[in-house]
């Protein structure tokens, strides 16, 4: 009886959310257009767009998008995030992951704003056009000179007090396993001497993914709309700076893999 009542309440809540879309969707479209215009103008006249305004605009847009999708972000261990610039290292299961993390950082008090490292192929999508508002770093993995230049850009962002997130698997991994971590993703933490925060995302796999791709990967979409963001214990630079980056990447991979397996079972 209790389960039936809970299911009914969830149904009612979702129904009310769908009903509210009549009002919310036009607002979202207007906010999206405004953000795209701001992103284009920011490239031309950056001095007119201070960070606090840009990050807040993106956070509000993302929050509304997740509301429309019916996604609830649950944060675990927020006290593990240092109140300063860090390198966030996360697993990657969905195109929704960056939005989930923007929401998680935006609603966690005292933590720095967050931006991302992304592959250059994504920079012309509507989502990552907006990400330019938060200084997303695009890298061309086929161009060594551009990658070297982007490393300086990453360090500059961290020096400005912004947290930087990287997905060291390099792509979305549609599997119940965590893909191999590439050690080069940690290089900026060594150069900028900042903490590494391992972060585990659970529940996002298959969201914003085509059925064809899911069938090809032979996996099912995560059920439900509750997505957990687990902040693991940060690693201070003094504890990894003299250690080979591949060993550090392996240790971070192990911790995220264990956390992912644990929360998938709960």
Curated annotation (Swiss-Prot):
Pathway: Phospholipid metabolism; CDP-diacylglycerol biosynthesis; CDP-diacylglycerol from sn-glycerol 3-phosphate: step 2/3. A motif (HXXXXD motif) lies at residues 92-97. GO terms for cellular component: membrane. One of its GO terms (biological process) is phosphatidic acid biosynthetic process. Disulfide bonds: none annotated. Pfam families: Acyltransferase (PF01553). It catalyses: a 1-acyl-sn-glycero-3-phosphate + an acyl-CoA = a 1,2-diacyl-sn-glycero-3-phosphate + CoA. Keywords: Acyltransferase, Lipid biosynthesis, Lipid metabolism, Phospholipid biosynthesis, Phospholipid metabolism, Transferase. One of its GO terms (molecular function) is 1-acylglycerol-3-phosphate O-acyltransferase activity. PANTHER family: 1-ACYL-SN-GLYCEROL-3-PHOSPHATE ACYLTRANSFERASE (PTHR10434), 1-ACYL-SN-GLYCEROL-3-PHOSPHATE ACYLTRANSFERASE-RELATED (PTHR10434:SF64). Belongs to the 1-acyl-sn-glycerol-3-phosphate acyltransferase family. This is Probable 1-acyl-sn-glycerol-3-phosphate acyltransferase.
């Amino acid at each position: 009886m209790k389960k039936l009542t809970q299911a009914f309440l969830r149904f009612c809540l979702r129904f009310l959310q769908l009903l509210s879309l009549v009002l919310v969707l036009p607002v979202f479209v207007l906010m999206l257009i405004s953000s795209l215009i701001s992103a284009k103008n920011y490239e031309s006249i950056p001095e007119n767009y201070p960070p606090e305004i840009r990050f807040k605009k993106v956070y509000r847009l993302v929050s509304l998008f997740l509301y429309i999708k019916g996604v609830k972000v649950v944060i675990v261990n927020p006290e593990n995030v240092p109140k300063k610039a860090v390198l966030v290292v996360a697993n990657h299961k969905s195109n929704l992951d960056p939005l989930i993390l923007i929401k998680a950082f935006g609603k966690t008090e005292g933590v720095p704003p967050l931006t991302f490292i992304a592959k250059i192929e994504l920079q012309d999508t509507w989502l990552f056009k907006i990400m330019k508002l938060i200084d997303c770093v695009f890298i061309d993995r086929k161009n060594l000179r551009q990658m070297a230049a982007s490393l300086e850009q990453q360090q500059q962002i961290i020096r400005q007090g912004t947290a930087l997130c990287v997905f060291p698997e390099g792509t979305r991994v549609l599997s119940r396993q965590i893909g191999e971590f590439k050690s080069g993703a940690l290089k900026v933490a060594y150069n900028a001497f900042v903490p590494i925060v391992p972060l585990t995302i659970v529940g996002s796999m298959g969201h914003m993914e085509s059925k064809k791709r899911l069938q090809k990967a032979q996996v099912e979409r995560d059920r439900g709309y509750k997505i957990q963001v687990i902040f693991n214990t940060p690693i201070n630079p003094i504890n990894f700076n003299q250690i080979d980056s591949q060993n550090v990447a392996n240790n971070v991979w192990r911790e995220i893999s264990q956390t992912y397996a644990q929360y998938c079972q709960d």
